[in-house]
């Protein structure tokens, strides 16, 4: 049976918005949980980098909220986490559950691509399979041959093809050091935060003539999907190209995080919100 770790953390008001847990905060907590699991059951992230010259870069992530959880619901939350190798050593996947007094709450699944590091301060590297010493730290039932496939490309195609586009927007940004990790490249939960900025700017600009957009501030996000192609680095300039659509009874925001070079987005984010059965607007 795959190994799980569980522990409790106190909750503070900075983890919440008025409508529930902050998705970017959940992603940060989830990444920390994956690091705890690796340290306890396999090889910790620091040792992977320093001793095994192996990095782990988040490539795909899915975050689902079962029920909204507010600041006044509980003093703490239980984190449950497990990890596995997938794709014959080409992926490491973690699965994180947030529970406790208000269970069920949220589930995060993140798939990382291993890198063979070059040894420079920027932690540059190329995708490579996990080495034999690293693979040996996992139990047989924690190794799966089938690779993870991101659902985001298919979701994006379906929303664009079958959804009703409500509005579009463009929000510039610059990456600063408080948004980065140790290698002076953005920490992946920043994609969630930047997408939220793009969404809120769409609401600010368009809610007057598209009242449906207000749902994205009045209700919590129910599902996020992320897909990463390349990172942003310190002081990189970029923009969030956002669109809002009504699709299959949900309000869906698609965000392309692009650099000044244009072309393929460096990251994609999809946010899904439930729509009320009765639509009455202020």
Question: Each predicted region: which residue ranges?
Answer:
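HotDog/MaoC-like acyl-thioester-processing domains
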Residues: 65-76, 82-155, 228, 232-237, ...
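Hot-dog-fold acyl-thioester-processing enzymes
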Residues: 1-60, 107-222, 276-282
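A structural signal for short, hydrophobic beta-strand segments that form beta-sheets
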Residues: 53, 58, 80-85, 221, ...
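Short beta-strands within extracellular/lumenal beta-sheet-rich domains
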Residues: 63, 223-226
């Amino acid at each position: 049976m795959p190994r799980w770790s569980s522990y409790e953390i106190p909750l503070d008001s900075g983890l919440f918005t008025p409508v529930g847990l902050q998705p970017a905060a959940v992603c940060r907590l989830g990444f920390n949980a994956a690091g705890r699991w690796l340290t306890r059951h396999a090889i910790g992230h620091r040792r992977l980098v320093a001793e095994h010259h192996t990095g782990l870069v988040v490539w795909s992530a899915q975050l689902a909220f079962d029920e909204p959880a507010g600041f006044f619901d509980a003093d703490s939350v239980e984190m449950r986490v497990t990890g596995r190798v997938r794709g014959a050593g080409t992926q490491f996947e973690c699965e994180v559950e947030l529970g406790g007094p208000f269970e069920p709450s949220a589930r995060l699944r993140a798939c990382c691509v291993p890198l063979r590091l070059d040894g420079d301060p920027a932690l540059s590297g190329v995708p490579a399979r996990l080495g034999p010493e690293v693979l040996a730290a996992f139990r047989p039932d924690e190794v799966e041959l089938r690779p993870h496939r991101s659902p985001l490309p298919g979701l994006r195609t379906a929303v664009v093809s079958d959804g009703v586009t409500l509005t579009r927007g463009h929000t510039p940004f610059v990456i600063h050091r408080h948004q980065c990790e140790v290698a002076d490249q953005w920490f992946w939960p920043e994609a969630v935060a930047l997408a939220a900025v793009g969404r809120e700017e769409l609401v600010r600009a368009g809610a007057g003539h598209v009242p449906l957009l207000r749902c994205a501030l009045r209700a919590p996000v129910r599902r996020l999907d992320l897909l990463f192609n390349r990172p942003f680095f310190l002081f990189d300039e970029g923009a969030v190209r956002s669109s809002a659509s009504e699709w299959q009874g949900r309000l869906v925001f698609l965000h392309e995080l692009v650099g000044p070079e244009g072309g393929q987005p460096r990251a994609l984010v999809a946010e899904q919100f439930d729509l009320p059965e009765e639509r009455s607007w202020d």
